[in-house]
């Protein structure tokens, strides 16, 4: 009976946390809406930076290669975090963890070779 009571208190504290987090978020949103200023002038949707009206066209076109490089960076950065976590727990994981990390690194290298092969990392098109 005591074990069930402890389990209920753990769930109850988690539910309190969720409830108060949602309440606090809704309270902050409502407060900002209630206290925030409202501008109904014609300049409301005019873009500006530091109080200065922009000159020229504000729509810039970037090459898709910038986005590809950013996506590749994020992907390989996340894998670096996984490898860091593995290196911290290498003593506890033993040989099985070493083999799994080796397979993971091999998949990373294969994906990098695939990106080089399809020329996804080439900046200049031929």
UniProtKB/Swiss-Prot annotation:
Checking InterPro entries in the record gives: NAD(P)H_OxRDtase_bac/plastid, NADH_UbQ/plastoQ_OxRdtase_su3, NDAH_ubi_oxred_su3_sf
Q: Which GO MF term does the entry hold, naming one?
A: NADH dehydrogenase (ubiquinone) activity
Q: Does the keyword Transmembrane helix apply?
A: yes
Subcellular localization is given as: Cell membrane
Transmembrane annotation, as ranges: 14-34, 66-86, 96-116
Predominant subcellular localization, coarse grouping? membrane
- Protein keywords: Cell membrane, Membrane, NAD, Quinone, Translocase, Transmembrane, Transmembrane helix, Transport, Ubiquinone
Cytoplasm is among the record's keywords = no
Question: Pfam families given for it?
Answer: Oxidored_q4
Q: What topology does the record note for this protein and the membrane?
A: Multi-pass membrane protein
Q: Which family does it belong to?
A: Belongs to the complex I subunit 3 family.
Q: Which HAMAP family match?
A: NDH1_NuoA
UniProt-recorded name of the protein:
NADH-quinone oxidoreductase subunit A
